[in-house]
Amino acid sequence: MITHMQKFVERNSISIKLIVVFFLTIILMIPASIINELVSERKERQNDAIKEIQSKWGEEQTITGPILCIPYQTYDLDKEGNKINVTTHKAFFLPDEINITGSISPVVRKRDLFKVVLYQTKLYFNGSFKLLDFSGISQKNTTILSKDAYFSIGISDMRGVEEFVTFNFNKIPLNCESGTHDNFSKGSGFTTENFDFIKDSSNLNNFSFELSLKGSENLKFIPVGKRTNIQLSSNWKTPSFDGAFLPDKREITDTGFVANWEILDFNRNFPQQWVDSEKDFSSSAFGVNLKLPIDLYKKTERSTKYAILFIALTFAIFFFIEVLKNFKVHPIQYVLIGSALCVFYLLLLSLSEQVGFDLAYLIASISVIGMIVL
């Protein structure tokens, strides 16, 4: 019986070895998937560390505005001519032209092993409102509350504002207070004091203000002008331009970048003026991203996805050497080889956090190849 079994094994040794190698490859998918989960866990810890730093410095910033709001009232009259059913509404107007220029000063901060890009920026805003068109709101029984007019500027994270803001309208300084009366920026931003728009306005109403802002990674804008012009510059060498609009002109060099956008009201999906209803500006946001050029966890995650392929190819090479050269490889040796390949990804993950992905890949490769050869 034993002799018959030995003959069967010898006669089908290649097929049996192929089956063993196949099942070993399947089994080694388990540690490979565990390593992939470990990479995901480290990536989550990185995100937590980044969020912690951002929460104390300032998160990604999106700037909306300025938006001019002029309240008005509609009412009915009773038989004696007294006002009844008085309802207050708000009419919103966007500027005809807005120009924004600014420079971004990035800095890389570190928490444990994790890095995040923070920035400070000084932005200069100027633009104009032409004579406003009230035909859309003027009714028989309507009173425009021009003395209660105000401007709102949305800033997604007010913790990043570094200096008090003075809003200048037709050379009249208007003080600002934190918070917006409207929900176009989820209430985050600042609002000017009330002013008399009819008294203080002219044929061309100019505005200007400066904004010193801190944030992290991303700086975006909403194109509120009938014509929106933005110019940004920075010494960051690896910017990524994202959002609804790419720059019309950009220059990226070893010393930084300069980018220019020119956007028309036809390019977006909201009007120049409206009444009461809220508008969704988020789909029109655009700007620049200052993330680090190398995300080692993404690279490591991509590498681990090919772990099963590397294991299978390595086993195939040894199998064909065994068949063609009559060089016997014990199943335990296949197990050790597969384990060494799994250790490669652990080395890659741990070393890349210290010395960078490229050097870590080289060191891990040399180490594993040495283990297999020896």
Language-model region placement:
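Alpha-helical transmembrane signal-anchor/signal-peptide segments
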Residues: I34-E60
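N-terminal Lys/Arg-rich, disordered targeting/topogenic segments
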Residues: M1-E10
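Alpha-helical membrane-embedding segments
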Residues: Y75-T87, A364-L374
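Transmembrane alpha-helical segments that form the functional core of multipass membrane systems
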Residues: F281-S282, F286-L374
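Membrane-entry segments of alpha-helical transmembrane domains in multi-pass membrane proteins
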Residues: S15-V20, K110-V117, N194-K199, K299-L309
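Soluble non-transmembrane domains of integral membrane proteins
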Residues: E44, D48, S55, G65, ...
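Hydrophobic membrane-insertion alpha-helices, especially the h-region
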Residues: K17-S33
